[in-house]
Amino acid sequence: MEQDKYLTVAAITKYIEKKFEVDPYMKQVFVRGEISNLKQPASGHLYFTVKDEFAMLRSVMFHKAVQKIGFVPEDGMNVLITGRIGVFTKAGRYQFYAEHMEPDGVGALYIQLEQLKSQLEKEGLFAETHKKVLPSFPSKVAVVTSKTGAAVRDILTTIHRRMPSVEVIVYPTIVQGEKAAQKIVENIGKINQRNDIDVMIIGRGGGSLEELWAFNEEPVVRAVYDSDVPVISAVGHETDFALSDFSADVRAATPTAAAELAVPDYRDLEERLAERKYRLLAVTRQALERKERSLEQLKQHLILNGPKHQLEQQMERTDYFSERLNNAFSKQIFVKQTVFDRLNDRLHYYHPNKEIELQKEQMALRLQALEKAMKQLLKDKQQSFFRQIDALEHLSPLSLLKRGFGVTYKENMLVKSVQELEVGDNIQVKMQGGQIEALITAKEEDISGN
């Protein structure tokens, strides 16, 4: 029948599909072009168009193949793609089924490196706030590198030269190849399981991007970031950078520089110790000189205001008043004697014997009373003087010291109340027989306010 020569749409599409399947040139096709109209739904497949200035080719890459490409394709990126040509029957069009893809022009490793760097930087793995401070005086240093080569020799030689007492523990590892990243991560984990490693150095000598790639792999970068032991990354030479340099606590330009960062030079320490010893001696000498001046001032103060000086002044006053009292007493006696002599002369003149006897008796009594009064006055003055002396001695700082009390000073100033002191203050306590210095470790104020 006439109608038998007509094919269905499905049949012709199936025929074309078979043609592509049996054509050896369509089974493995190498395509170079620019990605456009890129889409990636939840399934993880990539749908895009590969084009050049003359044509375009609809393409698809399934999720399993996408996971193997190692970078993130983007619109406008020039790529090299390997795959096959087939037919999408439902849409009735041929398309390119991509199985492998890599960037064209710039190597895939560079693209992958930049994309991983951007991702990890956004996560905060390179943040300065996370970086740990290297210990000043490590006793054990771990080194993760190849057991042969210049890197390990340079590190060992430099550490031994700068600080021979530091123990270096080498964790040999392969530093390039497919298993290098896994071995590096394992060794970082072993070091963190110990509790006696102060700092670790990871790295190798210089090389190409491919040779240094293990230190760019995400597991290594994350292991360096997560390490509790401070990490110095020394990958390559000054112009070489790896992502482990950014996640490490410190980046060293070379393995030798890493060793110099890890340990101090004992000769520098000796110079610093000598300088600090000199400064300490100078400060101590100045402090002693200040204390000696303060002690001398205190001695002068005690000499001028102490009980001995006060006693000497009171004794001088007592002598002065005693002399005045004696002079007054002598003057009174002289006056009375003069009166007596006059009266005696008059008595002799008038010969009043009875009156004379009476006057003599009265005079004697008066003289006796006067002498008694003068003696009592002198005794009272002396008793008052000695009471004042006792009071002065009782109030004297030296008397208080003899009874077990102490006088407290802070920065050469007399402390009168606990409120003038704070925890951590240095104080000086003057006691019987000398002086002590103390540090306030606790403070308790009297709640009564006294």
Curated annotation (Swiss-Prot):
Major localization class: cytoplasm
Record bears the keyword Hydrolase: yes
Coiled coil segments of this chain: none
Entry's family note: Belongs to the XseA family.
Function: Bidirectionally degrades single-stranded DNA into large acid-insoluble oligonucleotides, which are then degraded further into small acid-soluble oligonucleotides.
Self-association and partners: Heterooligomer composed of large and small subunits.
Name of this protein: Exodeoxyribonuclease 7 large subunit
Gene that this sequence comes from: xseA
